[in-house]
Each structure stands twice: as C-alpha cells, then as structure tokens.
C-alpha cells in the first residue's frame, strides 16, 4: 500500500537518515510520514484496514497510524496509539463522531503487533482485532456509512495536527503489511491472519549520531544528545573510573514531551559514550507522566543513587521525589541498568500544590540533605 504514497518532502528534514529493511518502513517520530490524495475511500461502505507495527514509544498526546479525518466536521476515520498503549479508533459519520479503544489486548513496545479494523456496514458494528484477539467491538446501527472528508490519507501521522506543533502525533517505529480492503473480512479470518509469527522478534532502536557529522551548526566538542531532544544536564558523579552525567531526553521527537533520563559516560570528560536511557516512565507506576530532573551522588556505602522528579497526572499533587540505583555495579561498570525503588521517597507537604521538583541531594557531616524546588 505504501508504494502508492509519497513521503513528507519538507526540506527542513533533508539530513534525516532513514534505517532500511526490505519488509518494513521506518517512521522516526517527527519527520517521516506518508500521504496521498484519497479517492477510493469515498466509495467504501464495508472495509478492512490491516497493518503490522513495532512501536518504540508513544507521545503523550498519542500518535496516528492511519488518518483520514476531519474532527471539526466529524468526518473520516483515524487509528491511533494512546500513551497507555491502547489502540484508538475514531469513526466520523458527518456531524457525529464515535471513538472506541482496545480493551482485551494492547500493543507491545519493541515487538511486532498485528492490528485489524473491520468496518461492518450491513451489520452495524466495527471490530478491532489486536494480536489475534478481538479486543473490542463498537455497535452503531446498521447501514451507516462513514462520511469521508476531502482530505489526504496519512500513514504514520495525525491528519488533524500540523507537523510543527508541539504535539505532532507522528508514529515512531517500524510498519509493514499495510492493507485497505473494500470488504469486511470475517472475524475468524482476521484472527487467523494475526498469529504473530514474528512476535518474539525484539525490534531494537539505537540513536544515531552519524546523520549530523556534516552539520556545521551542531556542536562537535560539547556534550549533546545523539539525536532529537535534550535539556537540563544534571546528576554528575564519578564512579569506577567513569564520569557520568544525565540529561532530560525525548527519543521520540525534538520536542519537550515524554521526558526520560538520557545517560553519557566518559573516562576523560572529553570523549563521551552514549548509554541506554537510565530512567524511563512506566504506565501505571508513580512516574508515568515522566522522569523529570534531579540529582545524583555516590552514597555513604559507595553505591550511586539517582534522585529524580516523578511526574504523574493521576496523583494530586502530581510531582514527588523518587529514587533509583544501579542493578549491578560489578557486572555493569558503565551503569547501563537502573532499578527504581518501589515507592516514592518524598511527597509534597501542605502548600502550593503541583510544583515540587528537581531534588538536589548531598552528604554533609555524615548526613543526607535534600533541596526541592517548589512554588
């Protein structure tokens, strides 16, 4: 299907380097998507949309996989991923819009996922099959046809969002086997086709600095992230012959969103090694909104510690202090793997709620002290 589409041609992204696979297309989370003027959708009554995706992450506002939608007029259809790994299907009938989500099965990060959306015009419902499981079904009444807008079809981008806005809705990961069929396949066939033969294949992503080697405007000597987004370098310490420093990172796109802890290490403070993310937010955990700024030290027992701001919009107040330390300092001298304490170590006391972050911790006279910025 993608052979009929054009890739975003914006010259602002002319230095992008796109990984290649024979069987799949890569979407970098901000500059790569595909589009075409649509015509065949106008005649579609019953149909099936099918694709396989291996996402690496999802932005806080969600990312589109398929979108031919005008939300102002409630026309068209969109299939999106939400930040909590659900598949969202939006149906527009013209003046009326219905939305439903995956329930029984959601998508996995870094693995192949098979998704099928089956619109049953005569029966009056829409099936959502995720990884061979009927994850949800929406009923809406028989013989209701989707009203398609006169908009292009986008693959990997939300049609309603400008590519330059802070929340871009651009898919990040691999995608393959995209099909749009002008018939509603049986649920048995959809499940049979979703065996996930390659579901055990881990699909890894490694940030790539090489695309910027010839960029005269990019610093070559000073510390800088391998790609996309960086702010607030913090938590420097020396341990086992290495200097460590961390920073606020977003591997999805060059915007402040879905903030995690990037990590660099060096023996001489000149030549730095990119390391995996030290901290990543987790759905359903105390830091699901983001792992924000903090500090680091080597404690009185000689163990490195990270103190960071745990953001969680489902809590009130929504900011608190969390703690993490390396999993194994002997087997992992570069401290690539960190484990979080199971509970928060400091929550906000009575006062102005909602601004309680950036803990700075130090040792003085054999005691630990902490300063926290607040409003």
Regions found by a protein language model. Give the residues of each.
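Beta-rich carbohydrate-recognition and catalytic domains
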Residues: 188-375
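Extracellular glycan-associated modules
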Residues: 1-205, 210
